[in-house]
Amino acid sequence: MSFQVSPGVRVKEVDLTNVVPAVSSSIGAFAGAFSWGPMGIPTQVTSENDLAEKFGTPNTTNNTSYFTAAAFLQYGNDLRVIRASTGALNAVASGSAVKIANSSSYTQSFEAGQGSVGPWAAKYPGTLGNSLRVEVCSSSGFASWAYATQFDAAPGTSSTATKLGVTGALDELHIVVLDEDGAWTGTANTILETFAFVSMAADAKNDNGTSNFYKDVVNAGSEYVWWMDHDTGLTDAGISLSAQATSKVFDGDGGTAIASSLSGGTDDDAY
C-alpha cells in the first residue's frame, strides 16, 4: 500500500445533474393588521415585495404583523395572508367614509351605486386611500387636460356606438388614477393607472365581447379604486346605446376633466 508523505489534492468528478436543488414547499398562514389590501379573506403572497404590493408597507402600529409575515417569506414562498377585519374605513370622493372590506363586500353593498359617497372609493380601507385622485375626461375636455399626453388620441365614439349607427355618440372617456399626495410613490401626482377609450354606455363592448362600460372596466382592472356612482357631470352615463336614436350625443364633462380627490380613509390596527 502506498502513502502520501506530503499534502496532496484528491480530484473527484461529480455529476451535477443528479443534484436536487433546495426548494421550499412549506405553506404558511398568517392573520394580522396591514395598511392596505382585502380584509377577511386569504390572499396568496410569494415574496416580501409581493407582500408590500398587496398589503402595503409597515407603519408604527402594524409593523409587527408585517415583519412577522416577511420573516416567513425569507424561507418560504407561499404564505396565505389574511388582513384582520378592523374598524378601518375606505377613502371616498364625498360624504362619510364607508367600509368596503373586499370584493364580496363591494358586490353585496355598493355595486349598484347605493353608497352615496360620490363617484369613487378607495379599493381597500386605510389612510393610503386619502392620497388617491381620479380624473375622468371626455372628448370636449381632452385638448386642455393635463394628462392628455398619456393617451394616443382623444376619446371619441366607441365601436359599439358605430355598429349601432350612433356614429356621433362621443361616448368614450379616458380615466387616470393619481397618487395625489405621494403616499404611494413618494412623488405627488404620479400616475398609478390609466384606462383609455372606455365608454359611458352600459352596453358597450370590446371587439372580443367583454364589457367596455367604464364602471366595469375600472372595477375589474383597478388596484386602487372602486366605482361608486356616476358623477353628476356625466348625465348620460349608464344608459344603453341600443336604446338611443342615431343622432344621440352623450353629455360629457362640459369641457373640463372631472377630478375627484378621495378622503376620509382611516387606519385601525387593533384586532
Q: What are these language model-derived features?
A:
Residues 1-271:
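Surface-exposed assembly/interface segments
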